[in-house]
Amino acid sequence: MTSEKPQNESFIQKIKSTSLVSQIIVAIILASLLAVISPESAKAFGMLGSLFVNALKAVAPILVLVLVTSAIANQKMDSSAELKPIVGLYFLGTLSAALVAVLLSFAFPTELTLDLAGATANPPQKLTEVLATLAFKVVENPVTAVASGNFIAVLAWGLGLGFSLKHASESSKGMVHDLSEAISSVVRIVIRFAPLGIFGLVANTIATTGFSALGEYSHLVAVLLSAMLIIALLVNPLIVFIITKKNPYPLVFTCLKESGITAFFTRSSAANIPVNMALCKKLDLHEDTYSVSIPLGATINMAGAAITITVLTLAAAYSLNIEVSFATAILLSVVASISACGASGVAGGSLLLIPLACSLFGINNDVAMQVVAIGFIIGVIQDSAETALNSSTDVVFSAAASHHITKE
């Protein structure tokens, strides 16, 4: 009897030490096999997927509220003018990424197989309707907004509280930061159950629809990766060339090789900060500048996240046969860019902000969270590529802006 306990503990420790990516890959393989061997059993495991989606729905609103409040309240922007062009490039890059994602989604629309039983969508017909809906959603009671998943109001209250708390005492700001960390830790616990949830979702999906759903996911991944490659290899080099008037590709390829590859496997912009710092030193950039711009970039430079939010939101709209005008898509790009800045440091952060963007099209929380769950299924590739783009771009823009400053 005594020998069983150490063996059980060893098994649990082994599971804990295995990366989440590996667990998700194993879950997808096992779910696919179960769906082929015993479709009825696979459908029964669909409950695990439903539990996971409901857990995401529970944590997402309070996460966005506290995260945005803390990020703004504790933001310490350096007064040095040298940072202004870098920050400007960060926002330009993020907005450009969202626009590229819109164009690719228009050219290659993705429709997903979703459970639409009881789902509602009240798509706006004109841009004026979108703006009117936004205005009314913004002024909702914060408690009601969190309870009902009104992410527009949640974001507005987060911004309002954050700017108000910028002038609060350091102890008050510290308390908000601690609360943000606590909520983030709860989210990490939920994400740890992602392999079980994804097992249930994949098993039920394949048992119900066959392997056609996985074909949809491959199309979705192709659109996401194409948008990220266009930003990394075309848009970012163009921005660097306009600033430096030099061939941008030696810098871009150096950053992709020395920062992007590491970030691809760590899947964390924050964890990649030391790598980026060392690369900036190797590139002989000003330490006073990059010591601030790199950590700042890990927080607000979120081109990959903007692409993920935009592509998956438009996929949800197409799945519900919602007509998306170009003007509304541009508004989505702006919302996705702003939302992406709050995705840093949170497990599945960009995915959990999708409901916020979906609310622009009147898509309810139930459908939005199904799209989030699909995001976790493809997250093995999506999150790695997203982080690689985000982190390598931090150095690309820091180097380009530093060159511009030196020239002046």
UniProtKB/Swiss-Prot annotation:
Keyword set, alphabetical order: Amino-acid transport, Cell inner membrane, Cell membrane, Membrane, Symport, Transmembrane, Transmembrane helix, Transport
Subcellular location: Cell inner membrane
GO MF terms held by the record: neutral L-amino acid:sodium symporter activity
Catalytic activity: L-serine(in) + Na(+)(in) = L-serine(out) + Na(+)(out); L-threonine(in) + Na(+)(in) = L-threonine(out) + Na(+)(out)
Transmembrane segments: 19-39, 48-68, 86-106, 143-163, 193-213, 223-243, 294-314, 322-342, 367-387
A single BP term in Gene Ontology: threonine transport
Topological category with respect to the lipid bilayer: Multi-pass membrane protein
Keyword Disulfide bond: no
Cellular component GO terms, alphabetical: plasma membrane
Family: Belongs to the dicarboxylate/amino acid:cation symporter (DAACS) (TC 2.A.23) family.
Function description: Involved in the import of serine and threonine into the cell, with the concomitant import of sodium (symport system).
Protein name per UniProt: Serine/threonine transporter SstT
Organism: Colwellia psychrerythraea (strain 34H / ATCC BAA-681)
